[in-house]
Amino acid sequence: MQTSPLLESLMEALRCLPGVGPKSAQRMAFHLLQRDRSGGMRLAQALTRAMSEIGHCCDCRTFTEEERCTICANARRQQNGQICVVESPADIHAIEQTGQFAGRYFVLMGHLSPLDGIGPMDIGLDRLEERLSQEPISEVILATNPTVEGEATANYIAEICAQYDIAASRIAHGVPVGGELEMVDGTTLSHSIAGRQKIHY
């Protein structure tokens, strides 16, 4: 069945989103055209502005339309002395929602993966090392993902921290709150046992 070239183009464009296949893209396109054209126009305008105006923070590399993001520009955060290293800007959002961290961040935009040709320079470790050498940083909290690549990246950064006599710590990984022990995978359970804490009364 032949369809409008513009409709085909819209569906193809929507497929660039994660988890969106041909059927989902078709449903989205038909919904916007049939029921929510004003929403489609708002989406188009927001996408156009975001793609042209959002760049990276000069300090932490997260997304921002300013030269420096609001977290890095916060004087209280600057005095904290802690930097939390994460793999993506989405990780910052997740950590900020906990309200448990009051320092600044550094976004790798990925992780080390020699098999894929991704080395230290590709994830900005040269810029991180520059910050470690120039700023009064007391601790680097490594919050990379609990994967083989994430662990390798954390270990690599910990070695850099040691060169500058800066404390490096790894976020704890373990059994999720509300989870059942029998449903937890072996690797997670191993991390939980290794990272156990004493109970103080």
From Swiss-Prot:
GO terms for molecular function: DNA binding; zinc ion binding. One of its GO terms (biological process) is DNA repair. Keywords: DNA damage, DNA recombination, DNA repair, Metal-binding, Zinc, Zinc-finger. The keyword DNA damage applies. PROSITE patterns: RECR, TOPRIM. The keyword Metal-binding applies. A zinc finger (C4-type) spans 57-72. SMART domains: TOPRIM. Gene3D superfamilies: 3.40.1360.10, 6.10.250.240, RecR Domain 1. Residues 81-176 form the Toprim domain. It comes from the Bacteria. It holds the Pfam family RecR_HhH. Belongs to the RecR family. May play a role in DNA repair. It seems to be involved in an RecBC-independent recombinational process of DNA repair. It may act with RecF and RecO. This is Recombination protein RecR. It comes from Proteus mirabilis (strain HI4320). The gene is recR.
